[in-house]
């Protein structure tokens, strides 16, 4: 198809969740509170890990990276969504839309790879505890973290460039809460079959490969736990992985449902709700999951609160 006489869009319009003003105001308040809790919760986790020497281990090094990813991911979507909820004209410039797609897609990919890395860390901790400190040394942890960030970013850059080279013509209405990959691809006025195949292949590489590594890790972990004779030992080993396993189910479950089969994807409303849950709630829930289900983190919280209480008491007297 020739594109010489086509008009190219300079901005997109995000249709969002609702056009009712009262609903939009309610959503604004809800998402603002959620975003504040997300930022506060994740930065508190990072601060806690920095302050407590007992948490200076590979597991919490990766958790620090995960918290940074969660805050960044939420920031790539929620502030723009908040602005649009109170705006009469919900436009987003072409460049801003491309940037949002790049950062949200990249940070999502980084999180998937990080979760696989964290699964490997738990595998070594449970299945080979005597050699844990030798295997999971600082150099390896740094390389694994860098690999996560680079792989997610490179995939996102490739997908963003391919997507925004498509001719969008005059079709500028994105029926989504953000510049989401599949929603933007649907705007193209050419056949996008090859793009959808590229999305599926990319999803398999960056989503299913880490997911398979997570599955293999947990098969070995469960097998090792079942061989432990004492009930107390099994409980301790399971609690070592409980927080990570919960986060894995949340993150991978929704992403697989959304991306692996783009042609047989759910309805637009379902896609919006899935994306909303993944981009708004998951970054908020992750620090809560690690705080509630992890004894070491809870112990560090109690120690920090005790120190703060002591300082407050001294200042009061």
UniProtKB/Swiss-Prot annotation:
Please classify the protein's predominant subcellular localization into one broad category: membrane
Tell me where the transmembrane regions lie.
26-49, 58-79, 101-120, 140-158, 197-219, 237-260, 273-292
Q: Where in the cell is it found?
A: Cell membrane
CDD domains, sorted: 7tmA_OR2F-like (cd15429)
Q: Which GO terms describe its biological process?
A: detection of chemical stimulus involved in sensory perception of smell
| Domain of life (superkingdom) | Eukaryota
The segments annotated as topological domain Extracellular are 1-25, 80-100, 159-196, 261-272
Keyword annotations of the record = Cell membrane, G-protein coupled receptor, Glycoprotein, Membrane, Olfaction, Receptor, Sensory transduction, Transducer, Transmembrane, Transmembrane helix
Record Pfam families: 7tm_4 (PF13853)
Q: What's its membrane topology?
A: Multi-pass membrane protein
Could you give one GO CC term from the UniProt record? plasma membrane
> Matching Gene3D superfamilies, A to Z?
Rhodopsin 7-helix transmembrane proteins (1.20.1070.10)
GO MF assignments: G protein-coupled receptor activity; olfactory receptor activity
Which residues are modified by glycosylation? 5
Q: What does this protein do?
A: Putative odorant or sperm cell receptor.
Q: Which family does it belong to?
A: Belongs to the G-protein coupled receptor 1 family.
Protein name, as recorded:
Olfactory receptor-like protein OLF3
Q: Which organism is it from?
A: Canis lupus familiaris (Dog)
